[in-house]
Amino acid sequence: MVKFFKVLFVLFGFLSISIAQKKVESPKLVVGIVIDQMCYEYLYRFESKFSKNGFKKLMNNGTHCRNTQYNYVPTFTGPGHASIYTGTTPDNHGIIGNEWFDRNAGETVNCVFDSTAYGIGTDSQNGKCSPHYLKANTITDQLRMTYPSSKVISMSIKDRGAILPGGHLSNGSYWFDNITGKFVTSSYFKKEMPFWVNTFNEKNYPNNYLNQTWNTLLLLEEYKESEPDNSPYEQLLQGKLTPTFPYDLKEMCKGQPNFNLFTSTPFANTYLTDFAVESIYNEMLGQDGQTDFLCISYSAPDIVGHAFGPYSIEMEDLYIRLDLEIARLIKELEKKVGKNQFTLFLTADHAVVPVPQYLLDKKLPGGYLFLESNLIQLDEEVKSEFGADLILSEENNNIYLDRETIDFLKIGRRDVELFIAKRIANWEGVKNVYTSEELINSTTDNSWKDMIRLGYVPNESGDVVFMLEPGYLPKTKDSEKSRKGTSHGSAFNYDTHVPLIWYGKGISKKEVFRRINITDITATLVHLLNVQKPNATTGEPILEVLEK
């Protein structure tokens, strides 16, 4: 027995030495790159068109987690960014969508809108933003709490893409105001705009880009990985009669700057990279003894992807150009922060479903659920059964009930939910329907229900939640326009399977094929930064990233 304990003691000693030797030295700077709407397959579908210093450099020299999945629904931008940076799912961090129906306000609210904040750099509503709906700490919050002198800078074209990654303690979160055509922030983060941001804004880059033409970077016939240019599945950009190259932005604007049009082009990615580089130099990121954190979210891929779909030449060209922006960013990081002095991760907030009409024409599973007619009929059925209008709203496949009226009339809420669930189950394209009771009290091992449950917050989500069959999208009504373009939000692989690559200091070259959940990113950063887990983190560290 004594010998046994001696052996254990020796083994424990070796283990302790091993762990001590593996203590990670934190990088000078962590760079989190989130690409808004990127399918995993783009890394390989467009690989032959990529340069050697962008995506390929990350893939060939970093740790590539090839089976990274979202483990909840809905797969939207707000929840995606929040889950990446909190390391937990919407049921904990509270961001259940880009918008949801607020029962108290009686209206739909944006996930980062804050009526108590005001814009810095703009007088428009676009400045009234903060992370006040975010109920959990981010890894960037944790870094600032542990090391108060560390800087966190976050930026995106979209407000939510900047605000949620930067968290509650960001030193600067900036997003693009499509009214003024400039980067702005809010009173939540700043009392006044930093001098360097004002200087950058004064250069009016978006106006200059709107005088240019978006044409393919390569010869049109080289885009063999995509559908023909003039595709029936693509939406029209304002000022254009066909969804085809070239896009003469000056002609399309017709004399008036259209900053929404600007964000629908690859130039918005270039503009964001310019801003990121300016922040590295002006905020002196990675230049002192404490680790800093730079959050960058490229929004243009999502805007272009919604309009044209994943098999469009527009999307392929955008990614070929984005590859060059990634290469430029890495070059600037190596120049200013130093090679092997920063750690970078690249992922996406969601992927995307192919245009359902494209799937139908290819004789593949897919289709549309047209909500308007179904909801009108459902309203009538509910009134007939219970004698009152009990449905307040539908948002993101959630049915919100008038709980006050139900309670006043002394109708069983469960009875109303079950009645509605049975009707919705008969709608074309509906796969599953769940009541709030089923989701709150769920103990079954049902992967679809579990994914919905992890995205469900009782006081924010609806009373009945439904999911569609693979390849289906919800639309308001049937029309030629509604069958063009695409979206995301489902529990299926085309929406949940995203890239995840780690690169830089402390990262070795390897491929990881086991399943990684998106919530594991923050759990891994905890050990790269040597900080406490953020308060609600449920993910697990990716050991392959941390091991040499």
What is each model feature region?
Residues 1-26:
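Bacterial Sec-dependent N-terminal signal peptides
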Residues 27-39, 58, 84, 143, ...:
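Beta-strand elements within well-structured catalytic alpha/beta cores of enzymes
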Residues 42, 262-288, 301-342, 418-419, ...:
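A long, amphipathic alpha-helix that forms part
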Residues 43-92, 151-155:
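Short, structured active-site-proximal loop/turn typified by the sulfatase FGly-forming signature C/S-X-P-X-R
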Residues 50, 67, 76, 98-128, ...:
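Secreted, luminal/periplasmic, and some membrane-associated catalytic domains
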Residues 56, 136-145, 396-433, 514-540, ...:
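Non-catalytic, well-ordered alpha-helical segments in soluble enzyme domains
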Residues 89, 97-290, 299-306, 428, ...:
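His/Asp/Glu-rich, glycine-adjacent segments
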Residues 373-411, 485-529, 546-548:
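Substrate-binding rim/cap in mid-to-C-terminal beta-strand-loop elements of soluble/periplasmic
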